[in-house]
Amino acid sequence: MRSLLPLSLSLSLLLVAPALAATNPGDDAEKAGEDAFEDAKNWTVQIRTSVNRPFTQDQTGSFQGAGMVVDARRGWVLTNKHVASSSYSSVTVTFHGGGPLPAQRLYVDPHLDLAVLAYDPSAAGRTPKEPELDCDASPPIGHPVGAFGHPWGFRFTGTRGITSAITSRLGPEMLQTDAPINSGNSGGPLISLVTGRVVGINTASMAKDRTEGISFAVPMPYACAIVDLLKKGEDPSPPAGLVDFAIDENEEPTLVVARSRLPAGAIDLRTGDELLALRSPDRALENQSDLMHALRGKLDDVTLSVRRDGAEVTLHGNWPAASRVIERQGLWISGALIAESEPMIRGQVQGSPSLMIHYVQDGSAAQAQDLQEYDLVLTANGRPVDSLASLQTLARESETSKSEMSLMLLRLGSVRNGLFVYQTRTLPLVDVEVVGPPKAPEMETAAQAVVSGPELSSQPGG
C-alpha cells in the first residue's frame, strides 16, 4: 500500500493543476494588457509634422509621433509639444486603418511637453472612441503599464513595463517607467495594464548608449487639467516664467525664490521666499510643477502662503500668464528667423534685449554673414529695436532703398573675450516675411501656417 500513496498524490496534483492554471492571476493580467492594447487602436493616432522655419528648441524637417483622441466631437488630439512643434508647421493625424487628415495646433503648452491638435471630425469618416483617463492621481511604483505608439515607424505597437518613480529631476514633474519609449512613441498613451486607463503621455527616454530602461511620461492629472480648461473655453496657460527658483544639492528644483522678475503690481515675491501653499482653495505645494498646475485658470487672483525671514506670511495678487505659443510671431530676414527672446534669456542680460535669432538657414545670406542662433539683436541701422514691429519697419526701409541692413548683436563669448561680446553684421536683404498669424487666433482655432506680407502688431506673441 505504501507504494500506491505517491501515485495517488501524483494523480491528485495532475487533476488540480489544470484548475490552478485556469485561475492563475497572471493570465488575467496578461489578458487585461492585451485588451488594453487592442482598445488603444481605436483612439490612438499617428502624427506627422513638417517644419520649415523653426523657433529655438525645434528642428527643421519632418517628424512622426503619436497622439490620442480626447474629444471626439471636437476632433481634439492630445500629444507632445515636441511632436506638434512650437513652430508653424504642417500636421496630419492618421487613425488605424485610415488615411492622413490635416490638423492644426489648438494649444501648445510653454511649461509641459504637451499640445492639443484639432482635426475636422466630419472628414474622419468615423467617430472614434475616447480613452478612459486617470485624472486623479499617478499610479504607484511597480504598477504595470504599457506604452502605445509607433516606435521607429512600427505603427500601433505596444510595449510593457512598470512605473519606476515620480521625478522632478528633469524640471517638470514626470512619471518614470521602464516601458520602452522610442522615436515614434512620443505623444502616445502610457496605459495602466490593470485598469486600462491612460496614466501618462509618453515623452522621452534616456540615451540608450548610457542607460537602459529609463523613460518618462507626463502624468495624466496635469494633462487633464489643460484639456478640461480648454473644454470650458478658458485659457490653460501656466504662469509666466518670471520667477527663478533655486536647485538643491540633489539637483532637484525647489520652491525657494532666487529672483523675481514679476512686474510691479503682481504678487510680491522676493528673493529667499519659500512657497508653501496656495490658498482659496487650500492646496500644499510640493514642487514647481505642482505650482504651475495649481495656478492654471486662476492667475488673476492668486493667494500664496510663503515662508519669509522665518515667518509664514500670506501674499495676494495676480501672476501674468505665459505667452501663448500658437500666437508667436517672427520675422524672416535673408534666411534668419528673428523673434522674441526665450524666457530663460529674457531679463538675464543688462538692458533685457527682447529680440533673438532663433534659426539660421543653411546656405542663406544670414549664414554667410555669420548670424548665429541665440544672438540677441540690439540695434538695426544704428537704431534700437525693442519689438518685431520696429525691426520690420527698419527692414522695410532698407528694402525700399535697396540698401543693406546693419545689425548690432550680443553673443555669448568665451573665457578669452568675456561672457558676452558685441558683434556687428551687415545683412543684404534677400526677403522680408512675417512668420506666424497676423492676429491672435481664438482658442477654438489653431494658428495659421507661415504667412507672408502682413504687418506685425506692436504686441507680438512670444
How would you describe each model-predicted region?
Residues 37, 193, 197-238, 417, ...:
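C-terminal subregion of chymotrypsin/trypsin-like serine protease catalytic domains
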